[in-house]
Curated annotation (Swiss-Prot):
The gene is dapA. This is 4-hydroxy-tetrahydrodipicolinate synthase. It catalyses: L-aspartate 4-semialdehyde + pyruvate = (2S,4S)-4-hydroxy-2,3,4,5-tetrahydrodipicolinate + H2O + H(+). Belongs to the DapA family. Homotetramer; dimer of dimers. It comes from the Bacteria. It comes from Rickettsia massiliae (strain Mtu5). It is found in: Cytoplasm. The active site is at Y141, K169. Coiled coil: none annotated. GO terms for molecular function: (R,S)-4-hydroxy-2-oxoglutarate aldolase activity; 4-hydroxy-tetrahydrodipicolinate synthase activity. GO terms for biological process: diaminopimelate biosynthetic process; glyoxylate catabolic process; lysine biosynthetic process via diaminopimelate.
Length: 300
């Protein structure tokens, strides 16, 4: 019963994929507090720490632990915390999952191992190992443009039968997929989109929410959009979605999280510091971001 309760609270609704703030090439814990408290203020359904948007691949293991520990302290059980545990090394991914459990997050997310191109059986065994490494609920993360490999529908079905694998975050472009998955998996397996621009279309096909990049700076508007959708106010949700579309576009004009890091900096949340091999936003991208922030009257 406890696992089902956690699933209901975490893998559903608006989950913000948080940026990780840096200053002088170190974690900026003061900025982290501003960022996290901004999410708590607008009652997002959960925050995702150390995912793709959080530059997880640039973090040392010690930084990863400090980031999670500090986030748990700041949140103080106000909202659930999901940690990112993706790695192309199964042993290291297990270590991330075990450390997440020890620190006290509420669940974790992981993608298939990137670069090494495992078979579907290899992907299954990777997640089976993560499942055995901890007691936390798990969300699968499908991001084929990043990882270079994806779950087949059959592998998702197999993995959904493991008792603590409870959701899928899908960053693909196949809008039929949630319908196909929904038809085969257990009833309480949730599917969410990771693409801001398709949230309404995705949820119309069986999704139950989204992990958002834009909600780093507009959690209040994203929350309102989902609330209208869940109340069957399709017109109201669509109006908000159309208003946000230029923001979604601006935030992906260059590789995520380059634009959202600059947007957060422009609004005073953190330094515009991003780790190599990523570089800060180009001048043209900065101008596009500034213009849409001004036109939408976004303030922190």
């Amino acid at each position: 019963m406890k696992i089902k309760k956690i699933m209901h609270n975490i893998f559903k609704g608006l989950i913000t994929a948080l940026i990780t703030p840096f200053k002088d090439n170190k974690l900026d814990l003061y900025a982290l507090e501003r960022i996290v408290k901004h999410q708590i203020k607008y009652e997002v359904d959960a925050v995702l720490i150390a995912g793709s948007t959080g530059e997880s691949s640039s973090l040392s293991f010690e930084e990863y632990k400090l980031l999670l520990q500090t986030s748990v302290e700041i949140v103080n059980k106000c909202i659930p915390i999901i940690s990112g545990c993706s790695s192309n090394n199964t042993t290291y991914a297990r270590a991330l999952a075990a450390e997440s459990t020890k620190i006290g997050v509420d669940g974790f997310m992981a993608s298939p191992p990137s670069y090494v191109k495992p078979t579907q059986h290899g992907i299954y065994k990777h997640f089976e190992a993560l499942h055995e490494a901890c007691n936390l609920p798990i969300m699968l993360y499908s991001a084929p443009t990043r990882s270079g490999v994806d779950f087949s529908d059959e592998t998702i079905l197999r993995l959904s039968k493991l008792p603590r694998i409870l959701a899928l975050k899908d960053c693909g472009v196949d809008l039929e997929r949630p319908l196909r998955i929904r038809a085969t998996v257990k009833k309480d397996f949730n599917i969410l989109t990771g693409n801001d621009e398709v949230v309404l279309a995705f949820n119309a096909q069986g999704g139950v929410g989204w992990t958002s990049v834009a909600s780093n700076i507009v959690p209040n508007i994203c929350k309102e959009l989902l609330e209208k959708w869940n109340k069957n106010d399709t017109k109201g949700a669509l109006e908000i979605h159309q208003k946000l579309l230029p923001l979604y576009t601006a935030l992906f004009v260059e590789s995520n999280p380059i634009p959202i890091k600059y947007a957060a900096h422009y609004l005073g949340l953190c330094e515009n510091e991003i780790r190599p091999p990523l570089t800060e936003a180009s001048d043209s991208a900065k101008k596009q971001i500034e213009n849409i922030i001004t036109s939408l009257s976004i303030k922190i």
